[in-house]
Amino acid sequence: MSGKNRRAVDKTPLNTPCNTTVLSSIRLNGNCAYTVYQGGTTAERFAEYLKTKLLPTLSEADIIVMDNMRFHHAKAVEQLLDSSKVTYLYLPPYSPDLNPIEKMWSKLKAFLRKEKIRIASELPSAISKGFLTIRPKDCIGWFRSCNYVQ
């Protein structure tokens, strides 16, 4: 029961979270490529994501913009990108303000908080539902706020 001047209380079960990782990319048209898995990210996992999820969707006019995560700079990743003939760029260090995907993650995390997922096995499905909420107008706004489009 809630009332005026009473603290809102929401019960959350105490558990030890497991590490769920999402690798993702967004495009100006609202299309997202992503993969979800348990555990941390390695250069091998990132290369697999590029090979199976992102690179098959790109045209020669597309540009991949990445932050400076260590695995983005791995030799195997750079060799894969070079062999694909895709253009790729790295953001300056510590520049989340230039990365539209940071804004996408803000929206997705807000969605996940509202979903109140408490069982790890339900998280991948909730993440997929969250990606369905991303619209082209969102992406245009995020890219515009980072000065990639007018």
Spans of model-derived segments:
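Extended, low-complexity cationic-aromatic segments
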Residues: 1-51, 148
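RNase H-like polynucleotidyl transferase catalytic core
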Residues: 6-14, 84-100
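C-terminal anion-handling pockets and recognition modules
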Residues: 32, 101-150
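Short, basic/hydrophobic alpha-helical segments
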Residues: 45-63
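Short alpha-helical elements
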Residues: 52-53, 65, 79, 116
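RNase H-like two-metal-ion nuclease catalytic core shared by retroviral integrases
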Residues: 67-68, 75, 89-113, 121
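Catalytic-core regions built around general acid/base machinery
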Residues: 76-85
